[in-house]
Amino acid sequence: MAKSAYESRLKKEYVERIRKAMQEQFSYANEMQIPRLDKIVINMGVGEATGDSKKPTVAAADLAAIAGQKPVITRARNSIAGFKLREGMPIGAKVTLRGVRMYDFLDRLINIALPRVRDFRGLNPKSFDGRGNFAMGIKEHIVFPEINYDKVDQMWGMDIIVCTTATNDDEARALLKEFNFPFRQ
């Protein structure tokens, strides 16, 4: 893939400021040990997909607008009779962001989307998995500016997983705080 001339604001901030701050805080022996963002995975599960097979397609279109990249339709792995679910039925959409799109999405998430969430008091600082990855959920996808509120017939939630190269939660928490993640006190 060709390298573009455009560099994201957050990527530039990471290279110029955040790496130095992380090096001072944790005093790594090697520059490659400094944690960085690896990828962001956005998953949108559509629970009502069993009744209407068009809903995952609509959710995927909204997710494509939010992420700026075409999502993959996720399908059920096995049948569950209680949920009227058959193996192979479309049940949601997911997208994996890396590189410039990842940093651009993170910028919009932190500065635009999270402040628009109703009754937002900050992200849970305990939502790390023990290996340096952070997971969060958003109940309404309309907080993103790419979604036209008037054209939305149904609101969906989404899971956002921020994967870092950090080896533990403390390093990942420090990295995300440097990116101005609004953690709860």
Swiss-Prot record:
GO terms for biological process: translation. Keywords: Ribonucleoprotein, Ribosomal protein, RNA-binding, rRNA-binding, tRNA-binding. This is Large ribosomal subunit protein uL5. HAMAP family: Ribosomal_uL5_B. The keyword Chloroplast does not apply. It comes from Rhizobium meliloti (strain 1021) (Ensifer meliloti). It comes from the Bacteria. Belongs to the universal ribosomal protein uL5 family. This is one of the proteins that bind and probably mediate the attachment of the 5S RNA into the large ribosomal subunit, where it forms part of the central protuberance. In the 70S ribosome it contacts protein S13 of the 30S subunit (bridge B1b), connecting the 2 subunits; this bridge is implicated in subunit movement. Contacts the P site tRNA; the 5S rRNA and some of its associated proteins might help stabilize positioning of ribosome-bound tRNAs. Signal peptide: none annotated. GO terms for cellular component: ribonucleoprotein complex; ribosome. Part of the 50S ribosomal subunit; part of the 5S rRNA/L5/L18/L25 subcomplex. Contacts the 5S rRNA and the P site tRNA. Forms a bridge to the 30S subunit in the 70S ribosome. GO terms for molecular function: rRNA binding; structural constituent of ribosome; tRNA binding. SUPFAM superfamilies: RL5-like. The gene is rplE.
